[in-house]
């Protein structure tokens, strides 16, 4: 199965190992991976900030860069959710609408692709430790993913997965929300960290590094013992 890799800005600039680990898992699943070096942002930051004209230019490039791809897979429910749910609105009454619809149907978040397309949940991973899982807003509400990451984590040998209270509550990041409303954003992250600590977990795992970056920063500020890991890093462990 041919897969085009989409590496979001956060991953590309700050957490490149997540992308490499995603490739490692996809190749073990039997996929042939290709990567377009010309790819850039999906356009979500500009769109969310209200700059629809600028966003449209970036999104048009995205459509061109990934045109013809059999499957597009990304380690970010946030970016995937944006392409799936908002590209068709952005390109309504546009010559690019058809391509936007096709792209929306071909792009998948990493766990969604593994479980629902490849129908594989066990990659022989092993990771000794206690962890709790954070449902990102984009994964839960835009990509409709709940059970998929947990199915994958349940097959990781040595990993004890413990659910925290209010697991579906936002971590407070929300892109520019964290900048515009910092006190609220930090308070939401503190609540998430408190719930995670109550499970006695050592790690918080999620599909989205943007959430994890925010949680990690707040956890360090609180001198919490909690560490964060992307799902791809866990699935690529131990083999």
Model segments located where?
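Iron-sulfur cluster-binding electron-transfer modules in prokaryotic oxidoreductases
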Residues: 1-239
């Amino acid at each position: 199965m041919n897969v085009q890799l989409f590496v979001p800005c956060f991953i590309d600039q700050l957490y490149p190992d997540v992308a490499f680990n995603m490739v490692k898992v996809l190749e073990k699943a039997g996929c042939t991976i290709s990567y377009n070096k010309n790819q850039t942002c999906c356009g979500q930051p500009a769109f969310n900030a209200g700059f629809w004209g600028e966003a449209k230019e970036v999104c048009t490039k995205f459509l061109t860069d990934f045109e013809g791809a059999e499957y597009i897979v990304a380690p970010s429910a946030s970016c995937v959710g944006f392409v799936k749910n908002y590209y068709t609105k952005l390109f309504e009454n546009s010559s690019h609408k058809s391509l936007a619809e096709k792209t929306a149907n071909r792009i998948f978040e990493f766990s969604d692709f593994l479980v629902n397309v490849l129908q594989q949940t066990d990659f022989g991973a092993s990771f000794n430790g206690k962890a709790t899982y954070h449902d990102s807003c984009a994964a839960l509400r835009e990509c409709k993913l709940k059970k998929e990451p947990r199915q994958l984590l349940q097959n990781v040998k040595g990993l004890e997965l413990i659910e925290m209270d209010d697991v579906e509550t936002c971590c407070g990041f929300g892109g520019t929300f964290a900048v515009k409303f910092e006190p609220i954003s930090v308070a939401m992250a503190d609540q998430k960290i408190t719930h995670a600590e109550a499970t006695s977990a050592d790690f918080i795992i999620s599909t989205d590094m943007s959430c994890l970056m925010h949680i990690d920063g707040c956890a360090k500020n609180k001198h919490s013992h909690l560490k964060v890991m992307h799902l791809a890093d866990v699935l690529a462990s131990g083999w």
